[in-house]
Amino acid sequence: MIADKDHKLFLNSISDTIDLFIAYTVKDSVARRIVKYVYNYEAQSTSTIPLHLSNKELAKELNVSEATIKSSLSRAKSSRLITVIGLGACRLISLNTKTICEIRDSLFSL
């Protein structure tokens, strides 16, 4: 649940390093922007519902084409930083905090 207090505390605790985690994991620039958009949504939202945007809406938000969104969303999903449930306008997109914790632990254990 996005509005969960512990989730918000976690998101605030990684605010200084989220760009590093994204850059380390996601190679495609638009895919990085998608993950960062989802992070910002969850960090600022008071909603209990994950982000739900169609390809067209997400393309408009990020100022890219729908075709670019399709391929970049696939790359963002393969990074495991976001979880996507459903298709099209019914799609829900949320951060995968378990993967972010694994990345944080591996980066800071070096």
Question: Which stretches of residues belong to each language-model region?
Answer:
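A generic structural micro-environment signature
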Residues: D16-L20, A59, T68, C101
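Short, amphipathic alpha-helical interaction segments positioned at domain boundaries
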Residues: I100-L110
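Winged helix-turn-helix DNA-binding recognition segment
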Residues: A43-L95
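Short intrinsically disordered terminal tails
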Residues: M1, L62-N63, L110
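Generic short N-terminal amphipathic or hydrophobic helices
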Residues: M1, L92, T99-E102
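Short recognition helix of helix-turn-helix/winged-helix DNA-binding domains
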Residues: M1-T48, L53-K56
